[in-house]
Amino acid sequence: MAITRPTLDQVLDIRTQLHMQLTHEQAASYLELMQPSFDAYDLVDELADFVPPIRYDRSSGYRHRPSAKENPLNAWYYRTEVNGAREGLLAGKTVALKDNISLAGVPMMNGAAPLEGFVPGFDATVVTRLLDAGATILGKATCEHYCLSGGSHTSDPAPVHNPHRHGYASGGSSSGSAALVASGEVDIAVGGDQGGSIRIPSAFCGTYGMKPTHGLVPYTGVMAIEATIDHVGPITGNVRDNALMLQAMAGADGLDPRQAAPQVDDYCSYLEKGVSGLRIGVLQEGFALANQDPRVADKVRDAIARLEALGAHVEPVSIPEHNLAGLLWHPIGCEGLTMQMMHGNGAGFNWKGLYDVGLLDKQASWRDDADQLSASLKLCMFVGQYGLSRYNGRYYAKAQNLARFARQGYDKALQTYDLLVMPTTPITAQPHPPANCSITEYVARALEMIGNTAPQDITGHPAMSIPCGLLDGLPVGLMLVAKHYAEGTIYQAAAAFEASVDWRTL
């Protein structure tokens, strides 16, 4: 099938878009010269796409969008059943996938109406690896609108509720993933994290959520926001399942440009080591956020004291770059997502790997009704588009340079300490804003909890939220941060804390 050739008028319009001056005669010459290039386009159009085969049968599996009665938390987007290998690290485990992760043959909406009706044609790498490890996939978990919220009120078509209190946020953007694990509907779930989206819902719901080192787990087949902050990782009900899940998913796949020789470890080997002798730095900046609830801080300090009682060496540490990293998220995240996720239709350009052409085509439809985009996404796009058009991306570029400086601040502290600890979020889960709330309230409830979680997306360090108590019946999260590829050390401390006490009694 031949692609549609441009007309002379279209070439003249392109001339204007490219800020050029051409006569009609010159434009006609270029139009003629363009034809051999379009012959190559014809060939590309005719050839079958080169994507991974679907290795696990789903012809017999059902696909069902649950009713409100079947889905009281609104945590499911689609139900299905895909059985993996008979044996493996995750044999017998049921799993939910965040709905920005491609599962071939099952609809994917990414919490956003423009993607309604999209059905992936191949599996994400993490899907294949979970199935290889014996897991059974039960469906797609609701996520926030294009994953741009730490609250759980932005998903199309309805908010996700916290299993501990209906009408309260489950956290975002992996809102359904954490809610399904916390409610016991699945054993384990996959989440994504660009500003805290694994760790925030884990803190709000009382689950264990690991944002791995950037690039440790392949992002192939997961809808991108901005490649330098894209992460995918496990959300579970206990530490061992988390370690097993990371073991199954980690490692290079040769298709993800985010990966540069990722170092995979034997994560379960750390679970019985205890914390005796571990050096833990209590990050002072992590307790100094403007909206820090002192009661949350007290719960976290009590948890740190327990780690000290178990044998860890604990002392305060200051890393000024922590705050800088959080601020760098604005030019990197806003300009990056505006280019890659929006103008680049969920893919962007200039990288080698696996592109989802069908997703790119579907994502382009956001322009047909941009008014329906969420307020939190619009805000990021307004900032990003202004930075790109007024300053030509210079602040994105400079912020990426400064991100290396911010990483050095963490790395320097982690030469002295094995772990850094702080509250995952400064607050517990908050009530959903009313449906008719102002733009200001809508956005505030989407972003009020990211102060401690966004920095590690910028620096790439592994960070995990573990539940450490209840406050007025709502979970509190303790966050553990380690060196790049030192997820095992995080599991070491998390397992020791978990074994020492039932967090629900704290």
Curated annotation (Swiss-Prot):
Tell me the active site.
Answer: 98, 173, 197
Q: What keywords were assigned to this record?
A: Hydrolase
Q: Which Pfam families match?
A: Amidase
**Does the keyword Hydrolase feature in the UniProt annotation?**
yes
The EC category is hydrolase
Q: What is its EC number?
A: 3.5.1.4
* Keyword match Hydrolase: yes
- Fetch the Gene3D superfamilies from UniProt: Amidase signature (AS) domain (3.90.1300.10), Glu-tRNAGln amidotransferase C subunit, N-terminal domain (1.10.20.60)
| UniProt-listed PROSITE patterns | AMIDASES (PS00571)
Instruction: Mention one GO molecular function.
Output: amidase activity
Which reactions fall under this protein's catalytic activity? a monocarboxylic acid amide + H2O = a monocarboxylate + NH4(+)
Name the PANTHER family for this protein.
AMIDASE, TRANSAMIDASE
Q: Could you say which protein family the record assigns here?
A: Belongs to the amidase family.
What is the protein name stated in its UniProt record? Amidase
Naturally occurring in which organism (per UniProt): Pseudomonas chlororaphis
